[in-house]
């Protein structure tokens, strides 16, 4: 819900453009969170250089991180979730009731807690979950007869299964579509997966059509101003890069090869972005309304006063999960496009 106390016109424009964030997502909506698998035979997929073979859809799923949790619900597996961890923001409204019945952890559960839930499958949106000191590597889990899948955006570059924090590959919307397809196959919901992808592609196509011919030279920085004075920005290898391109903008940090990087205030001033995208995080009750705190940090920083986006108060606040591979990506691109090019919508 938009905070009525917000008075900065540019912020209000941005948030009004994103008003759909708290309602049912057209590209993600697929009906109820629980649905019987439509495919029940043996399946095999390959992800992150790892082959995953299942004789039947998993019945006891533990989902880690927001994009994985929402994907499980979107695929109709909400009633098969035995536990979840790490929601970044409020879950999409259509899955709220189902999620409320699922055990939830704000942090990683201990291995003992995980094993006590007797999962037969762990679905994670980030590779960090599969490290020996967290949930265990994918090989560790396999030794306990627990299959697992990590989203392709966060595949380790080598040594599949060991969960080591290695350099990651470039992610695109095709990476997201592949994950949705493969997880849909594994969970026995290939038709629902295809429907999600079709809806996302329709939103992307509509957005591209609307911004075609618009001025795409506007520079956009996805950045979080930290308490230590540095700024965490999104580089050119994550899904954010294509989100900005689809929205009709130019990533101010596209030349940075990594997904995220810490930059100095001086570098941020030198790049002088026209628009700053903010994504408040992290907690299961957070919404775009919490973005006002991030806006206030920028506008209160004297060293950033002359940055075009700060001076003109051009901030776009989006839900954090939309900036990482998952079912919200298409809507996030459309929401940013509406704020960058309101005359096209």
PLM-predicted stretches and their roles:
Residues 67-70, 87-90, 121-122, 127-131, ...:
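Solvent-exposed loop/turn segments at secondary-structure junctions
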Residues 111-124, 265-281:
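Proline-aspartate-enriched helix->loop->beta-strand connector
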Residues 170-179, 194, 255-256, 275-345:
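Structured C-terminal subdomain patch of bacterial secreted/periplasmic proteins
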Residues 128-136, 146-182, 215-239:
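Extracytoplasmic ligand-binding site segments that recognize negatively charged/polar headgroups
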Residues 60, 64-130, 252, 287:
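A short, structured surface patch at a secondary-structure boundary
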Residues 47-49, 102-112, 132, 256-265:
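Short helix-initiation/N-cap motifs at beta->coil->alpha
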Residues 2-69, 185-223, 342-345:
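Bacterial Sec-exported substrate-binding components of ABC uptake systems
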Residues 87-91, 99-100, 233-260, 320:
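Alpha-helical, coiled-coil/dimerization segments enriched in small aliphatic residues
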């Amino acid at each position: 819900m938009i905070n009525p106390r917000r008075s900065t016109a540019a912020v209000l424009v941005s948030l009004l453009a994103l008003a759909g964030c708290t309602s049912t997502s057209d590209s993600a909506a697929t009906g109820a969170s629980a649905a019987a698998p439509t495919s029940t035979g043996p399946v095999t997929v390959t992800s992150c250089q790892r082959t995953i073979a299942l004789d039947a859809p998993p019945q006891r799923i533990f989902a880690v991180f927001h994009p994985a949790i929402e994907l499980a619900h979107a695929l109709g597996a909400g009633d098969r979730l035995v536990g979840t961890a790490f929601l970044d923001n409020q879950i999409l409204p259509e899955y709220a009731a189902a999620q409320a019945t699922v055990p939830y952890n704000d942090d990683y559960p201990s291995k003992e807690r995980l094993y006590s839930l007797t999962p037969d499958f762990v679905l994670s949106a980030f590779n960090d979950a599969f490290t020996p000191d967290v949930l265990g590597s994918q090989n560790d889990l396999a030794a306990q007869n627990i299959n697992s899948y990590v989203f392709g955006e966060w595949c380790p570059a080598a040594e599949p299964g060991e969960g080591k924090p290695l350099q990651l590959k470039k992610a695109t919307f095709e990476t997201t579509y592949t994950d949705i397809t493969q997880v849909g196959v594994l969970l026995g919901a290939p038709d629902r997966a295809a429907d999600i992808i079709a809806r996302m592609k329709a939103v992307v196509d509509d957005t591209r059509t609307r911004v075609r011919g618009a001025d795409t030279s506007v520079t956009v920085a996805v950045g979080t101003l930290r308490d230590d004075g540095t700024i965490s920005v999104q580089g050119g290898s994550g899904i954010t890069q294509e989100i900005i391109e689809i929205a009709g903008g130019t990533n101010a940090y596209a030349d940075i090869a990594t997904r995220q990087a810490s930059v100095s205030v001086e570098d941020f001033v030198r790049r002088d972005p026209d628009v700053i995208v903010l994504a408040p995080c992290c907690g299961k009750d957070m919404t775009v309304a919490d973005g006002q705190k991030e806006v206030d940090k920028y506008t209160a920083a004297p060293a950033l006063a002359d940055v075009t986006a700060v001076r003109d108060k051009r901030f776009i606040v989006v839900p954090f999960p939309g900036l990482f591979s998952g079912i919200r990506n298409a809507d996030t691109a459309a929401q940013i496009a509406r704020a960058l090019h309101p005359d096209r919508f």
